[in-house]
Swiss-Prot record:
Residues binding Zn(2+): C83, C99, C106
Summary of the function given for this chain in its UniProt record: Catalyzes the hydrolysis of the adenine ring of phosphoribosyl-AMP.
A single cellular component GO annotation: cytoplasm
Gene Ontology biological-process annotations: L-histidine biosynthetic process
Annotated organism of origin: Rhodospirillum centenum (strain ATCC 51521 / SW)
Quaternary structure annotation from Swiss-Prot or TrEMBL: Homodimer.
Name of the protein: Phosphoribosyl-AMP cyclohydrolase
Length: 133
């Protein structure tokens, strides 16, 4: 990725006051929405340079290399920006589960029939992902 392409991308993006933009991760071959996270210029550069998705952790205030702890990494297939430049869509190849709860994706709760229902089972217990428990 050339500096000119990065500069053009950053010129089109509208980062918030903290220098962040929301990024939706979607499984490239099935269309499954996996998660929402945040990216800054540094995480975008690293993701595009290496092909492995890197986010910005708002709680840790540091780069978050998805899967460093759990092994559940995301390989970038394509990065897209929306019409307003205020959100990214990352088409990824998810290795394992995307959610820290051990579910395939982070959208495992739904309002159905007037109740909040869990619609996806845990695939990998959190203690296996993170060695806690």
């Amino acid at each position: 990725m050339t500096t000119a392409v990065l500069e053009a991308l950053f010129a089109e993006l509208r980062f918030d006051a903290d220098g962040l933009v929301p990024a939706i991760a979607q499984q490239h071959d099935t269309g499954e929405v996996l998660m929402l996270a945040w990216m800054n210029r540094e995480s975008i550069k690293e993701t595009l340079a290496g092909g492995r998705v890197v986010y910005w952790s708002r709680s840790r205030r540091a780069l978050w290399r998805k899967g460093d702890t759990s092994g559940q990494i995301q390989h970038l297939k394509e990065l897209r920006l929306d019409c307003d430049g205020d959100a990214l869509l990352l088409l990824v190849d998810q290795v394992g589960v995307a959610c820290h709860t051990g579910r395939r994706n982070c959208f495992y709760r739904a309002v159905r029939d007037g109740t909040l229902a869990v619609i996806a089972d845990v695939e990998v217990p959190a203690e296996e992902l993170y060695g806690k428990g």
